[in-house]
């Protein structure tokens, strides 16, 4: 195993009520740790909404803790989430970008507010159900902690964890990093967890699965505007620029509009390609591989390097969205951010999303695409 768990002390496990964090708590108890399960409530604006699953998730987490015999506690981080994550989320959408709140939520809530709270409970480590790994290495600068991809490539979550620092990683355990999801479900069934078949959570971090347009409208003023082609032809009206992202095909409302057609009468689909905030216009292009959707370079800022120092210039690999295959690239970093040049043009590189850099299985860090 990459991550050797030697010192058996107190570890606080973030328990969400899902199968991953439940199995994490059980595994650590089996390894001899004093486990405390902690449920984090991070959203309370609409607790009575049909989309809010917090109550059931809390009951699921408490039930698992009781079954496996670990202490269980509850903490409310709703204020911290709103100030540190949600406010940034709204600012980014207002600026025409498409943020990834899961990245900031991990850095500010799960591995900062949660870590601080766990330390106040006398914990030596925290643990979560993320699919990633931590490795301690000896260097000329002393012991350093590397963030590695999970063994299960289909579930690897290192992309969302790239903003973690050395202090956070030194206190963090990821027991599921060495397992495949099928093994986790099997363990859950074998030990009799009632949530063994519970589906994985999706949607905005901690806010859940709810109609995005309806949700965003509650917090962000939006105005309709024209949908235009690169030539300036008006095709329709958008509902507000915040509701669209680069490369979006569904939900444009122009499905019946014909553009350039082939000899057989068929035509390529329309894709969202650019936002003009000044004129409140959404530009769309026809065809998945339209030049407006392809980029062979990018610039990122608001950077975090896991090691604390920028990597040397050279050849690496990068992801510009979750579940994307690693793309070979050249890195040039400076004090304000970094530039990437890709061997092959990347599709729909989206401002506000994270560009995350890798050296093999090692996640080096990343920044926000501008």
UniProtKB/Swiss-Prot annotation:
Residues bound to ATP are 14-21, 40, 129
- Single GO cellular component annotation? cytoplasm
- Which stretches of sequence are listed as region Interaction with target base in tRNA? 100-102
Q: Record's Pfam families?
A: tRNA_Me_trans, tRNA_Me_trans_C, tRNA_Me_trans_M
The EC designation for this entry is: 2.8.1.13
GO terms of biological process kind: tRNA wobble position uridine thiolation
Function, as annotated, reads: Catalyzes the 2-thiolation of uridine at the wobble position (U34) of tRNA, leading to the formation of s(2)U34.
Family that this chain belongs to: Belongs to the MnmA/TRMU family.
Q: Which PANTHER family match?
A: MITOCHONDRIAL TRNA-SPECIFIC 2-THIOURIDYLASE 1, TRNA 5-METHYLAMINOMETHYL-2-THIOURIDYLATE -METHYLTRANSFERASE
For this entry, the protein name equals: tRNA-specific 2-thiouridylase MnmA
